[in-house]
């Protein structure tokens, strides 16, 4: 049954539409984004164009020209992408082929798989008579000489290889592979006995069979399946290799309806090996006799114009890693497109010429943290000054004293501090007794300071008798005389009346009380309590009370001892002033004349403690700093207007003047009267504190700790 022209046109359009749908597959090129990836978009477009031309060369009966039949075929050509490394024009030497054309120009280049038997190209589901009639009506007939040559060559079994029937599955399609070690299946394509002698000389690696995933078409769509299968079968018979997704290292779970295979036009080795690319990376797994892959532009210069309305298949982003067996294929792409290689470390490496152990960023001392930077600055300052700073210790009160005291009698006590030659008057001792005495330690401080508490205690004495009394005395027990206070303390104190000791760890205090007042409660330990009922028992230390103290530590600073504070209160007051000196009090726009401004200039000002800082009006760049510690007066311009006018001075209703101790002055005026009043009230409120801020020891201390 002959097909009409409209049916033929419709059938051709359906065939091309199926080809376009088949081309929408994940690309074997490992690419991400064409604009910023390692592979240029031109290669992908050339690959699609080449694949379209290869399909367009096949007629309805799926007869396509062999890649090995072209004059430009080189040794190991597998990719039609490389246009720069080819030495000959690609398509000019071939005769122009129309779609569904079977006329092919034969070249002298020898190819084993250059012909296919007419019986192997038939399709069982398609009527052979319809196909032949369609070819007779649409295509150019072969000449008599070429037809006779073709029939003679096809009848020779040594020069042709019959492909499998077109209705077999893709898993049975035999495919010649470049490297059999990398093939999925290493079964031979045909028996070695049927090979010609010429083929044994040319071919190095034996052809193998590649198992391909099946299509996901419906069972009812037989026309498309049979046409594609017959086309693939004929291409195999002509030496056209099939490149699948699996062959490039992709998993089978990524195959779908679009997993139609595109022919990359494989060829066997050629005698002309000087055109082979030698700059491609050779893997160690490649055999020594295997030649590297080369490129050909056989189908790039085709005059055939693709349909502009046809959708161009996009290459999606490939997230899986490539198969390491095809490293040479990926290296070929790198050699074509890569211009530079960027390597970036994901870890930070710290290099040093000194061998030292890594220390933690914080050091724990009695559950109190001290920044390591401050600790280093403190240790360096101690080495430079050769001192240990100043330690303030204030004894506040004695709490919860448990030693027995005589009722109705006053027990007095005193204390001594190691390293201090002090004489403390006797004071009354109770269970809670206030002391409130402060002491400073300027010289080198030992690791601990011991405070010893001592009570007024008289040990018992034996009454002695005269000589005459001894003669006339009886054998009575000698009596002892003691006062009630000493009698109550007997057995709880030492012979000199010491009833407790308090130990202050200076190493701990120097870190916990650095630059601040630290309140501590320390135990009072007694080492002289003895049980009267027990005999020859060594006394054990026991807690008999608590002592509350306040400590404050200043590190060694490059200032004289006279400049250091004399007490904890003065040190805390100076530090509060230093903290206030860093506080923002007022800000806004003012016009200034004087100082660094010989004429009126509008600036943005900030009153930070005792400093009036000027910034640029727009960029807010710091321009000048006015120290108000030497300022003595803040004068309103309205006050000057009532008195004698100054020569050359311009008075403003919203202006004021700052006068310094050396007679200099700077004039300001605000944008409104309300802003002027706010500035003047803030300046007058804090002007008295500005003169007390600048202490040398606070500057030195803050430079160490902040």
Swiss-Prot record:
It is found in: Cytoplasm, Cell cortex; Cytoplasm, Cytoskeleton. Residues 583-688 form the PH domain. Belongs to the BUD4 family. One of its GO terms (cellular component) is cytoplasm. Keywords: Cell cycle, Cell division, Cytoplasm, Cytoskeleton, Mitosis, Phosphoprotein. Responsible for the proper stability and function of septins during cytokinesis. Required for the correct formation of the medial septin ring structure in mitosis and for the proper localization of endo-glucanases agn1 and eng1, which are needed for efficient cell separation. May act as a landmark for the localization of hydrolytic proteins to the medial region. Transmembrane segments: none annotated. GO terms for molecular function: GTP binding; phosphatidylinositol-4,5-bisphosphate binding. GO terms for biological process: cell division; septin ring organization. Pfam families: PH. Induction: Cell cycle-regulated with a peak during septation (at protein level). Induced by transcription factor ace2 during mitosis. Degraded via SCF-dependent proteolysis. Residues 81-90, 149-169 have a biased composition (Polar residues). This is Septin ring organizing protein mid2. The modification Phosphoserine is found at residue 379. Residues 62-102, 145-180 are annotated as: Disordered. InterPro entries: Bud4, PH-like_dom_sf, PH_domain.
């Amino acid at each position: 049954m002959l097909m009409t022209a409209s049916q033929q046109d419709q059938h051709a359009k359906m065939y091309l539409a199926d080809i376009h749908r088949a081309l929408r597959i994940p690309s074997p090129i490992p690419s991400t984004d064409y604009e910023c990836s390692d592979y240029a978009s031109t290669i992908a477009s050339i690959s699609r164009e080449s694949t379209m031309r290869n399909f367009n060369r096949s007629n309805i009966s799926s007869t396509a020209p062999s890649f090995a039949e072209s004059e430009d075929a080189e040794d190991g050509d597998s990719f039609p992408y490389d246009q720069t490394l080819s030495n000959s024009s690609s398509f000019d030497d071939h005769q122009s082929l129309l779609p569904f054309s079977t006329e092919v120009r034969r070249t002298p280049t020898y190819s084993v798989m250059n012909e296919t038997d007419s019986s192997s190209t038939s399709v069982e589901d398609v009527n052979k008579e319809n196909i032949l009639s369609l070819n007779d009506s649409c295509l150019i007939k072969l000449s008599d000489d070429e037809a006779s040559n073709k029939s003679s060559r096809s009848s020779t079994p040594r020069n042709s290889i019959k492909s499998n029937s077109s209705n077999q599955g893709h898993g049975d399609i035999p495919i010649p592979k470049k490297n059999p070690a990398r093939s999925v299946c290493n079964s031979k394509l045909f028996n070695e006995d049927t090979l010609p002698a010429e083929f044994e000389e040319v071919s190095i690696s034996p052809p193998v069979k590649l198992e391909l995933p099946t299509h996901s078409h419906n069972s009812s769509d037989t026309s498309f399946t049979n046409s594609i299968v017959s086309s693939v079968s004929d291409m195999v018979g002509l030496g056209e290799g099939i490149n699948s997704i699996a062959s490039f290292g992709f998993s089978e779970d990524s195959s779908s309806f679009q997993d139609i295979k595109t022919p990359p036009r494989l060829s066997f080795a050629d005698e002309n090996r000087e055109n082979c690319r030698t700059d491609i990376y050779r893997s160690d797994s490649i055999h020594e006799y295997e030649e590297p892959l080369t490129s050909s532009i056989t189908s790039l210069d085709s005059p055939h114009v693709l349909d502009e309305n046809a959708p161009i298949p996009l290459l999606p982003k490939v997230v899986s890693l490539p198969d390491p067996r095809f490293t040479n294929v990926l290296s070929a792409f790198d050699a074509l497109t890569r211009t530079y290689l960027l390597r970036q470390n994901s870890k930070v490496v710290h290099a040093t010429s000194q061998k030292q152990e890594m220390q933690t960023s914080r050091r724990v001392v009695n559950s109190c943290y001290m920044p390591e930077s401050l600790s280093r600055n403190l240790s360096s300052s101690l080495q430079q000054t050769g001192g240990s700073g100043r330690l303030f210790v204030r004894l506040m009160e004695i709490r919860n004293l448990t030693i027995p005291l005589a009722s109705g009698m006053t027990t007095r006590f005193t204390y001594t501090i190691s390293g201090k030659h002090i004489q403390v008057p006797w004071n009354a001792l109770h269970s809670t007794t206030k002391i409130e005495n402060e002491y400073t330690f300027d010289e080198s401080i030992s690791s601990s300071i011991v405070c010893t508490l001592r009570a007024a205690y008289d040990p018992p004495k034996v009454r002695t008798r005269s000589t005459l009394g001894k003669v006339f005395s009886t054998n009575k027990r000698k009596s002892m005389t003691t006062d009630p206070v000493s009698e109550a303390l007997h057995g709880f104190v030492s012979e000199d009346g010491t009833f407790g000791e308090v130990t202050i760890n200076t190493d701990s205090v120097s870190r916990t009380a650095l630059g601040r007042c630290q309140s501590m409660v320390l135990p009072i330990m007694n080492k002289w309590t003895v049980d009267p009922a027990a005999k020859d028992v060594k006394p054990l230390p026991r807690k008999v009370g608590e002592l509350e103290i306040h400590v404050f530590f200043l590190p060694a600073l490059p200032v004289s001892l006279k400049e250091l504070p004399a007490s904890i209160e003065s040190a805390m007051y100076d530090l509060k002033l230093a903290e206030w000196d860093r506080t923002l009090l007022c800000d806004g726009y003012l016009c200034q004349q004087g100082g660094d401004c010989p004429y009126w200039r509008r600036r943005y000002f900030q009153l930070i403690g005792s400093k009036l800082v000027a910034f640029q009006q727009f960029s807010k760049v710091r321009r000048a700093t006015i120290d108000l510690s030497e300022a003595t007066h803040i004068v309103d311009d309205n006050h000057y207007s009532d008195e004698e006018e100054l020569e050359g001075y311009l008075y403003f209703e919203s202006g004021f003047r700052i006068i310094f101790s050396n007679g200099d002055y700077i004039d300001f005026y605000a944008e409104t009267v309300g802003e002027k009043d706010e500035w003047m009230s803030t300046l007058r409120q804090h002007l008295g504190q500005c003169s007390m801020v600048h202490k040398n020891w606070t500057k030195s201390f803050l430079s160490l700790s902040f």
